[in-house]
């Protein structure tokens, strides 16, 4: 990966979800989900308090996380598209 997130930013790859009709047709852009599942690819060093103390991120590379739909900025990394989000945008870590 050519990207290294800074501060509390996290690089994720959203899992592709597709809806199909009963006959098997894929409905493009038909997702009505309010959340998405993503895999954490890289994690920044964390945030700093006003006194300069470093607060480490609560997620690690490889974690599966739940993120609100529409969160983050999509960027190209090589041939793939990934998203850069803030740790505060993560709703939950999936077990």
UniProtKB/Swiss-Prot annotation:
Q: GO CC terms for this protein? A: cytoplasm
Its taxonomic placement starts with: Bacteria, Bacillati, Bacillota, Bacilli, Lactobacillales
The job of this chain, per UniProt, is described as: Together with the chaperonin GroEL, plays an essential role in assisting protein folding. The GroEL-GroES system forms a nano-cage that allows encapsulation of the non-native substrate proteins and provides a physical environment optimized to promote and accelerate protein folding. GroES binds to the apical surface of the GroEL ring, thereby capping the opening of the GroEL channel.
GO BP field = chaperone cofactor-dependent protein refolding
Instruction: Alphabetically list the UniProt keywords.
Output: Chaperone, Cytoplasm
For whether the record's keyword set contains Zinc, the answer is: no
Q: Which InterPro entries match?
A: Chaperonin_GroES, Chaperonin_GroES_sf, Chaprnonin_Cpn10_CS, GroES-like_sf
The UniProt entry, under Gene3D superfamilies, shows:
GroES chaperonin
Family of this protein? Belongs to the GroES chaperonin family.
Looking up SUPFAM superfamilies in the UniProt record yields: GroES-like
- Molecular function per GO: ATP binding; metal ion binding; protein folding chaperone; protein-folding chaperone binding; unfolded protein binding
The record's section on PROSITE patterns has: CHAPERONINS_CPN10 (PS00681)
Q: Where does the UniProt annotation locate this protein?
A: Cytoplasm
Task: Indicate the quaternary assembly.
Answer: Heptamer of 7 subunits arranged in a ring. Interacts with the chaperonin GroEL.
Output this protein's name.
Co-chaperonin GroES
Principal localization reads cytoplasm
| Record keyword Cytoplasm present | yes
């Amino acid at each position: 990966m050519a990207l290294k997130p800074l501060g509390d930013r996290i690089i994720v790859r959203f899992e592709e979800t597709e809806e199909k009709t009963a006959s098997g047709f894929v409905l493009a852009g038909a997702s009505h989900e309010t959340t998405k599942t993503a895999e954490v690819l890289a994690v920044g060093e964390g945030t700093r308090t006003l006194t300069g103390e470093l607060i480490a991120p609560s997620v690690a590379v490889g974690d599966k996380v739940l993120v609100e739909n529409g969160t983050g900025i999509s960027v190209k990394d090589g041939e793939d598209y990934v998203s850069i989000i803030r740790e505060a945008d993560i709703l939950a870590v999936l077990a």
